[in-house]
């Protein structure tokens, strides 16, 4: 329960700060990762967590995160968030039953794949929103009529038209 509460607090806070400022201090990951390590040390001492499996899962998650970051699929905060989640949730939370009864031995990978699916679903939300703009007498492409159709299709699922004043600049 404590791990889930810490994760929800961490993700809620980091999402809120990201939306407000687009910048997030590395201290967030250090604090929550540190708290996760304290819990892990206690659980290893109490005999409810295998040190070998915990270290293996965290190291594998860190290697995967840093690889994704190195090849450009992650940014720094994404990699740190994934590593921190691996520390907080090295294994499936007890008491929460999976929908299909299948539990991955590498739970952080499950978290990652679910976040990829959630991120992809955001593209569907953007598509519906952008297709509805003409119904509101607004245009996504005003001033961009000369752009090729393929670029407009990409913008339909990835773009969000906002006023210049709402974008934080340097």
Identify the residue ranges that each predicted region occupies:
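A membrane-topology feature that recognizes alpha-helical transmembrane segments
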Residues: 1-170
